[in-house]
Amino acid sequence: MSLIFRRNLSTCLKLFQSTGKPINRFQTLYGNKSSPKSQGNQKRTKRMINGNKNHHHHHQQQQQRSERIIDPRKFEFKEGSETSKSAISSLISKIYYQSSNFMVEQVGESGLIKIHLSKILENLNLSKQGIQLIDRPKSDDDEGGRLLPLIKIVPIQEMNSWYNDLLAKSKQIELLEIGSVKTLKTLEIKLKQEQKKSATKEFQLKWSISINDLKNQKKLEIQKIIQNSKTQKSFLINVVYNKSNPGRLIDTIFKDEEDLEIEFKKRELLKKILEEEILNDLDCKWSVEGDLKTKLVYQVTPKQIQQETNKSVDKEEQPKKEKKKKQLHTQAKPKSKTSEEDLDDLYSFKIED
């Protein structure tokens, strides 16, 4: 035992002499930064930090998924009729054709609002409200040379009527493809009627017209238009240079000052004849826009139409006036009776005196 103790003591003394410093075994174990255990601890802390970051990112992804916008094509309406639902689905497909991400511009009270279509559909009561897709021209400012679809909230009846017209047109196209003769005839009649209703008749006069022609032939033509005013509400008389360049300046036509003065006086005379001798003599009302340097546009309305409109207004007002007269008459009757009774009482009182 003593020998073993001596050996251990001698080895310890040798080590102490070689280093010159007391040995700390804990420092050798944990004090060395480059030890593999300390590196493992550092890696462990890095993993913890990265793990927290990944957890936060995963949480954000979950929130984004929860706030994800619904595809308008998959939107289910609880309210509204089947016609309304099919009408709005047809409009959604039209909007998708114009904007694949369903970003639209809504017509609001404060102006145009850029919004996703699903947000509009969420707040829409399909039993009362619908949407309207307003036509917009193409523009180079927007992506792909197109503006965003313009959406307006309208009453449900307006959307349903649009859808019914769409169905009717599609049926007509189907019948035309089959080769139905009846549909062709009805379409032609409808087109003619629409053209008559929408088109405003225009009567052209050139500045180069002679005064005799204006007083005779053109006056008769204008008179015929006014007489046939049952089908035409109002019409325009355009006094122009020519059809290709109607509003050409007088200075560009006549360079010489004398010619310019003569032309200007002639135009003044034509204007005077047209207004005083033709339009004022005929049964119509008129207003004029433009000037003698370029062109004149007269809007002429026959008085027959105005008389008919006044008659219709009078017819509506007549029953109201009659009712008022009856009410006044009924109110006046008891007053007259009371006044007669008062007179009788006074008369009898005087006789007694």
UniProtKB/Swiss-Prot annotation:
Keyword tags: Mitochondrion, Transit peptide
Pfam family, one: mIF3
GO CC, any one term: mitochondrion
Annotated transit peptide: 1-26
Principal location class: mitochondrion
Stretches for region Disordered: 306-341
Subcellular locations according to the entry: Mitochondrion
Composition skew (Basic residues), residue ranges: 321-336
Intrachain disulfide bonds: none
Domain of life: Eukaryota
Entry's family note: Belongs to the AIM23 family.
The name this protein goes by in its record: Altered inheritance of mitochondria protein 23, mitochondrial
Organism: Candida tropicalis (strain ATCC MYA-3404 / T1) (Yeast)
Species classification: Eukaryota, Fungi, Dikarya, Ascomycota, Saccharomycotina
Gene field: AIM23
